[in-house]
């Protein structure tokens, strides 16, 4: 994991611990300060490939550390 990937992962992890729900890409970019949303998305996608972050495509606020478990959002509809 690169230093920037680690920084994004820690931002996601801290967001979960502090607020109890997923950050948006915009939230992560804002916390990072100097990063755009496109760069944030690429890093989050890479973290998903590495298996340290999970998300559901097409559904908002589903970026979460791999250690977080919650009900499948489709079951709740």
Q: What do the PLM-derived regions correspond to, one by one?
A:
Residues 22-34:
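A short alpha-helical element within helix-turn-helix/winged-helix DNA-binding domains
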Residues 44-45:
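Short, hydrophobic-biased segments on the C-terminal half of alpha helices
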Residues 39-40:
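Helix-turn-helix DNA-binding helix
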Residues 7-14:
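Pre-recognition alpha-helix immediately N-terminal to the DNA-recognition helix
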Residues 4-7, 51-52:
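Contiguous, function-dense segments enriched for cysteine-driven chemistry
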Residues 48-58:
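A short, conserved structural fragment
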Residues 2-5, 19, 58-77:
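Short, cationic-aromatic polyanion-contact patches
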Residues 14-20:
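Short helix-capping/hinge SLiMs at alpha-helix to coil transitions
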């Amino acid at each position: 994991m690169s230093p920037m990937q680690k920084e994004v992962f820690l931002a996601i992890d801290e967001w979960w611990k502090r607020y109890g729900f997923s950050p948006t890409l915009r939230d992560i970019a804002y916390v990072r300060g100097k990063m755009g949303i496109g760069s944030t998305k690429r890093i989050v996608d890479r973290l998903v490939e590495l298996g340290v972050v999970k998300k559901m495509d097409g559904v908002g606020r589903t970026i979460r550390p791999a250690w977080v478990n919650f009900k499948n959002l489709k079951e709740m509809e």
